Amino acid sequence: MIKLFVGLGNPGPEYEATRHNAGFWWIDALARELKVTLVPERSYHGLVARASVAGHSVWLLQPQTFMNLSGKSVAALARFFKIPPEEILVAHDELDIPPGQAKLKRGGSHAGHNGLRDIHAQLGTSDYWRLRIGIGHPGVKAEVVNWVLKKPAPDQRTLIEDSILHSLKAYPALLAGDMDKATLLVHTTKPPRPKTARPAQAQAAPQAGAD
């Protein structure tokens, strides 16, 4: 089961509505769902909340170290409570996924994301879960920094928020450790199409009876 949910972002009102803070938005939504409040915890360099689910403690964390030092916060809490990497989920903004979509994966490279890069370094492994929240790509690599540190257009913000609400449907499965189900829930962005009713078979013509 996932015992530590982390959302990545930058602290401060000037960053609050920027694309790079999509992970913070996800944790805020999860905190509302679990009816807990994030409070400052200096020992873990972040805003922290604890929820009790089926007798187990579950932690929510928003590092307040700025993005590039996120691993300092994640590692401090994970080590204190002896939470292994495979029981950590990090929600973060993802350039390679369009707004309106999210993807769940375990392990892999940091793909240039500085928050993930520092978590890799501080945990000593990449073997943790990520919830990749699509923010789209500006199309030009040189524009990436400006892109992530700017507010999305209102229609894009709506799409990102929709993907956050959709992916939250998976949190009970994440808490239960049913990662296959959680992945299916996150990746299924549209309800399946109803099966098309087969046309009624033409009624067979009555056969002529033998004389």
From Swiss-Prot:
The record marks D93 as: Stabilizes the basic form of H active site to accept a proton. It is an enzyme of class 3 (hydrolase). Pfam families: Pept_tRNA_hydro. It is found in: Cytoplasm. Its main location: cytoplasm. InterPro entries: Pept_tRNA_hydro (IPR001328), Pept_tRNA_hydro_CS (IPR018171), Pept_tRNA_hydro_sf (IPR036416). GO terms for biological process: protein quality control for misfolded or incompletely synthesized proteins; rescue of stalled ribosome. Coiled coil: none annotated. GO terms for molecular function: peptidyl-tRNA hydrolase activity; tRNA binding. It comes from the Bacteria. Its EC number is 3.1.1.29. The record marks N10 as: Discriminates between blocked and unblocked aminoacyl-tRNA. It catalyses: an N-acyl-L-alpha-aminoacyl-tRNA + H2O = an N-acyl-L-amino acid + a tRNA + H(+). Belongs to the PTH family. Hydrolyzes ribosome-free peptidyl-tRNAs (with 1 or more amino acids incorporated), which drop off the ribosome during protein synthesis, or as a result of ribosome stalling. This is Peptidyl-tRNA hydrolase. It comes from Acidovorax sp. (strain JS42).
